[in-house]
Each structure stands twice: as structure tokens, then as C-alpha cells.
Amino acid sequence: MNAPNLVAFLVVALVGCGGSQKSKVAKLQKRVDYLEDKIEAMSDDDGASVVLAERVEAHEERLGKLETQANRVPRRLPTRPRPDPNAVYSVGVTGRPSVGAKNAWVTVVKASEFACPFCERARPTMDTLLKDYKGDIRIVYRHFVVHPQSATIPAHAACAAHKQGKFKKMYNLIWDRGFKAGRDLSKANMIKLGRQAGLKIPKMKKDMEGDCPKIVREDQSALQKVGVLGTPAFYINGRFLSGARPVSQFKVLVDEELAKAKASGIPRKDYYQHIVKTGLKKFTP
């Protein structure tokens, strides 16, 4: 079943169930199970699987409400544990590419990959934050590859660009002339974009085959430890926020963290290091 048919199937599952509440729960659960299996079977190039996965989560919530109305009919309700949004996690940034104030009061770590449509959707949100909190915020980029067949090569290319001091230029080129241009994330296109970014191509190729695979794996491992399961995910001075949310939701956390940082008595240049030192080193479900 292709993505459009799956979406239609999902709508029918939500509005087309008749009978008792218990019957609705049973039928909806079967459909959710079916959709989960289909999502897992989808090609990792298919961004629609990400969309459907989020919709399934929303429908799981509806199923929970139906269960309450049906006197808590027993069923399997798989949930993905997520980090506590009020907790502060230790997310290192040493040596990773960043944009914004070097000694910022607020550090936003963005966990993302280049095959994720929601990661691209969050790109202008990050630009808005950099503009509206100029001098007080920085965005640090770390790789979290969900679709290895399509997202690994551009991650290596972005890493190689960072080694030549041109990460942001390459980052935007990959999105604009790679992902948004027919999702051409091939090595050949990355080399082409590297030339456009002004990279030294022999060094780029060497780094893509040398240090960068290790660096990307290190990012993946570090982010998994603090609870990242999908993309995009963000840590705002160590506080978790997931998904391509409206900029207003980011600003709520940024404002809270900015006020907290300024009132801490800790020098600006030392503040994020204090978070890394004192934050939770691991997410425990």
C-alpha cells in the first residue's frame, strides 16, 4: 500500500468505525497495528513514513481516550518514552558546528538528518531564533541519522565542510539543492555542492572517508544516551523539545532559559559548560 492509500486508510480507521466503544477500540487497534507494520516496511527514502508515524502516535492518544470511555478495555498500548521536558540533560557541543553567539546564554542543540522533511521545516525556525535573540543564542548542529541509506552521505559531506570552516553554507546547499531538488543526496551531488560552497574537494573527499564517519557515529551515540529516538530533536540549555514546532513554543523555553541564565551569577562564557557538567548524563525511561 502506497503512502496516499495509507493516509486514506487512516482516515477511514478514525471515522468509519461503528458499534460499541469496545468494538471501536478493537478495530482501531488492529488498524494502528497494521499501519505500524507498514511504516516499518516502507523504504527509508520515503519521508511519508515519518508523517505517518507521527499520525499513528496521535491516534494512539485517541485510542487511550476510547479505552477510558469503554471502561478501560485491556489492550497493548506501545509508547515511546521521551526525555522529561523539565529535566536538564548534558549534551556536549565541543568541536561541533554552530551558528550564533560564541558565548551565548542559551545553546540550542539540534539533532537532525538531511533526509527528514521535518528537519528542513525547522530550519527557518532556527533562523528566526538567531535573529530575535541575536547575541544571546547559538544553534549547535549534531547528526542523528534515521535513514542511513539516504542521510549518511550528506552527513559526512556536512562534516567535511565544517572541517574547512564552511558548514552553514554547505548545510543550506544540501537542503536547497539536494533535499529540495529531488532529494538528490548522492555522493556525486555532495561533491558538486562542495565545489559550490568553495571547499577543497580532495580534502573533502578524504574527510568524508576518514574522520567524518566516526564523528557522525559519535553524534548518534551521544544523542541516543540522552533520549533522542527521531528527528528533529532539540535541547535548549539541556531541556528537550521534539518536532518541527511553531517558533512560539521554542521562544517559551528560550525565554525561560535566558532569564535563568542571567540570574545564575555564572559568567556567560562558562554557563553552558556548567549545564554540561551538572546535567543528566543519560536518559532513563
What are these language model-derived features?
Residues 5, 145-285:
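Cysteine-centric redox/oxidoreductase cores and disulfide-bonded domains
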Residues 19-147, 214-220, 259, 263-285:
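Extracytoplasmic thiol/disulfide redox context detector
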Residues 11, 110-113, 228:
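Processing junctions and N-termini across compartments
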Residues 9-11, 93, 236:
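Exposed boundary/loop context
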Residues 14-16:
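C-terminal motif of bacterial Sec signal peptides marking the signal peptidase cleavage site
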Residues 1-7:
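Bacterial N-terminal signal peptides that target proteins for export
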